[in-house]
From Swiss-Prot:
It catalyses: Endonucleolytic cleavage at a junction such as a reciprocal single-stranded crossover between two homologous DNA duplexes (Holliday junction). It is an enzyme of class 3 (hydrolase). Its main location: cytoplasm. Binds 2 Mg(2+) ion per subunit. This is Crossover junction endodeoxyribonuclease RuvC. Homodimer which binds Holliday junction (HJ) DNA. The HJ becomes 2-fold symmetrical on binding to RuvC with unstacked arms; it has a different conformation from HJ DNA in complex with RuvA. In the full resolvosome a probable DNA-RuvA(4)-RuvB(12)-RuvC(2) complex forms which resolves the HJ. The gene is ruvC.
Amino acid sequence: MRVLGVDPGSRFMGFGVVEEKRGRLVHVGHGVIKGDPALPLSDRLRDLHGALTAALVKYRPAAVAVEGVFTFRNARSALVLGHARGVALLAAAQAGLPVFEYAPAKVKKAVGAGGADGKDAVARMVRTFLELDASVLERADASDALAVALCHLNHGRAAVPAASASGKKRKGAAALLADRLAPAYRRPEAR
């Protein structure tokens, strides 16, 4: 299954595409769509919509996963983010794709980062899961979007047994994520 994850924003909208293929998580692509802050918001949203639609056509995902809104102290920032999320939801709906939304805390948890962990921890875990070099993910927007896609691949498959004491082989995205997490949590001297 191929999933396009979206980290919405009106200035920088990250997208990341991950596919579960023959028991492996494969990085298909990612990018950051830049909105011109000099443009009126309506024009910026139009441009974001066009670029995200182009990504949907290029990568042909089976589903779109969008990060939800978190609590803001600034109401204006929350409204603008809501508009950017609306653009992502609209582009997916126009493409006829199912859309799934995940809270930021759930996304962090899905990749093994905790609530207090920052974007660097999320990026590090995404690189671990997808076996990417540090130089590949330049912006947090792209790594956050890949984390949202990983969250979707893991969500709903948690019922798959992670591993048994008998050593039976694990299956599904949840097991793949667990396998990739194990080395990341080893102490440096144990690596």
